[in-house]
């Protein structure tokens, strides 16, 4: 806006006159606050350019006014900008022989170490919060891969996709760490050929079990159904039904069913799917 530009011009004029004085750090702080308002506006390119301005303003001010009593304003801002960040999206289920795909948004994580463990959890407890005991639910380490990440600098968010091939059926947990930094992200996933979809158009909810890759219906699969125990939050097995030649299993109408998961012989680790009143 015009007001913002006028204010910025005034700050620039003041800085040109008083820049050598220690109190000119206050002018720089005001400039930084002005830039902060723009930091999340506009497109990514604009945001990145504003970030770069804030970063260089902080660096220059720390060098120029090292003894100024509010210099920590700039140091704290740099620390916040350079804080490592890791946001990860991944599939709950991976087809055997395909990749576990991790979609990552990251800031200041030069290297990532991805470790994949067999999980000692029951598949229905994949999402359960075990708190401090979570680590004890990790079994054998099956893979460890280090990825070097592209970083334009130490403060801009970037994104990337990491792929790790998975072959054997089972329930797993990935744990991602950043060497030298206190940051860990973990999640569970299953390696299974089975996919389950529910629909509740009729009185009896139906489950269709298919091959995750081809979409072909699977006959003779077992669909285990569960409900949540409201007292302690655990998921309790209620019973099971089998799929017919069309890959369809009919769930009992009268039971309170909240989760299902398909199993077929050794393919027994698929993660639960929640059932909503109108299907998954």
Residue ranges: model-predicted function:
Residues 1-280:
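N-terminal, cleavable Sec-dependent signal peptides of secreted/periplasmic/extracellular proteins
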